[in-house]
Amino acid sequence: MALLYADEDFSYPVVQRLRQLGHDLLTAHEAGQAGQSITDTAVLAFATAAGRAVVTFNRRHFIRLHAEVSSHAGIIVCTRDDDVLALADRIHQQLQSVPTLQDQLLRINRPARA
């Protein structure tokens, strides 16, 4: 399963569900990185040094970072979804569909509302 780093704004219930699905997640809070106004560049560098892909709701900045940073452990950008179990399941399905996260950008979108 995937080694992931959930940034400060990421949903803890989604983290918990992904852990139940077998993924190894470290949160910014657990890493002592929360509440310090750490830049997105530093978040990505920290995660990459730990061999973990960043999982975030901060789509705009991390999509830009993916284009700017030549090597990273992966970036997963998500659309916020009140259905946290469904979001976690979509992330899990995407993770199972890629052989590696190294230098990859995964976009996890909320389904269109009917």
What are these regions (language model features)?
Residues 1-8, 12-20, 26, 33-35, ...:
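Acidic, PIN/NYN-like endoribonuclease modules and their adjacent C-terminal/linker elements
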Residues 40, 50:
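Basic, amphipathic alpha-helical patches used to engage nucleic acids or provide basic targeting signals
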Residues 52-65:
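Acidic, metal-binding active-site segment of PIN/NYN-like and related structure-specific nucleases
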